[in-house]
Regions:
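Alpha-helical membrane-anchoring segments
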Residues: 1-284
Length: 284
């Protein structure tokens, strides 16, 4: 009971907890990206760490957040067209917390996080609707037959795994051929009627994301909103280990959610994603 009380007490200060988890994910992301443009990052890290160790108690500025933001900005400047989509989300989340460190108004921070989540999820919907390849079901069909989706479930079925390996080998062999030959391959389906299933899955994905975006916009703290949001995150993780992106969405949900049980679920998702990122089982 004592530990449950401590957990509940920790979850009640959801902004502080979300900030700590954000730093955790930031640390993993920055560590993985540290080798990129190191000549710029070394002085930033040196000055940031030196300032944090010696003057953090005498300085009102959030040194850690400023350091992380500058490191993210370096990657953005040099690899604008190559960084992951959630790099932008990470920057805006850090910027929101950085500004919060000065104005100390939770309502402004939570509104910024809410708007960011709505934009991210709604943009994902628009992007999917504008992609003929996605809306036709070709994306899901190709990725499933290659084993890029639902791989963790496919591994439990040896016969399905063999089909995936066969399809992957066919693609590899095709890439080795002269493209002027205009040769082609035909995939073996991992599941019967995978073409129809892919189209259904497309519309289920779009509808769920649209519902979540609308719910976050109008009812950001509702229990039902976060039930749908958490279900969406878990569904994506079951499909593919997009751990970096899902960790950020979960942290955003933690900022807004008032239900202790769902807060705990968000925390578990973030920690799980963090472990998968460190062990390189997930995507950073």
């Amino acid at each position: 009971m004592k530990y449950l009380t401590v957990i509940k007490h920790t979850l009640k200060d959801r902004i502080a907890l979300a900030n700590q988890l954000l730093i955790l994910i930031l640390a993993a992301y920055v560590f993985i990206m540290a080798e990129e443009h190191r000549r710029w990052k070394i002085p930033v890290l040196f000055i940031g760490l030196l300032s944090w160790f010696f003057v953090r108690h005498k300085n009102k500025h959030p040194i850690i957040w400023i350091t992380f933001f500058v490191l993210l900005a370096v990657d953005l400047c040099f690899k604008y067209f190559w960084v992951a989509n959630h790099h932008f989300m990470l920057m805006f989340m850090v910027l929101s917390v950085l500004i919060y460190s000065y104005h100390k108004r939770p309502d402004i921070l939570l509104t910024n996080i809410q708007i960011l989540l709505v934009i991210v999820v709604l943009t994902s919907v628009v992007q999917k609707l504008m992609s003929p390849q996605f809306m036709s079901g070709d994306f899901y069909y190709y990725m499933t037959n290659r084993g890029a989706l639902f791989r963790n479930f496919i591994n439990f079925f040896p016969e399905k795994l063999e089909i995936v390996k066969s399809n992957s080998k066919s693609v590899f062999d095709l890439h080795a051929l002269d493209p002027n030959l205009e040769d082609h391959i035909v995939f073996k389906n991992v599941l019967p009627n995978l073409g129809s299933i892919s189209i259904i899955f497309v519309w289920v994905t779009v509808v769920i994301e649209l519902v979540v975006a609308i719910a976050l916009l109008f009812k950001p703290k509702s229990l039902w909103t976060h039930l749908f949001f958490a279900a969406m995150i878990l569904g994506i993780l079951c499909t593919r280990f997009e751990t970096g992106f899902m960790a950020l969405l979960s942290i955003g949900g933690l900022y807004l959610c008032k239900n202790l049980y769902l807060q705990l679920l968000y925390v578990l998702i973030v920690i799980g994603c963090f472990i998968l990122i460190l062990t390189k089982l997930g995507y950073h």
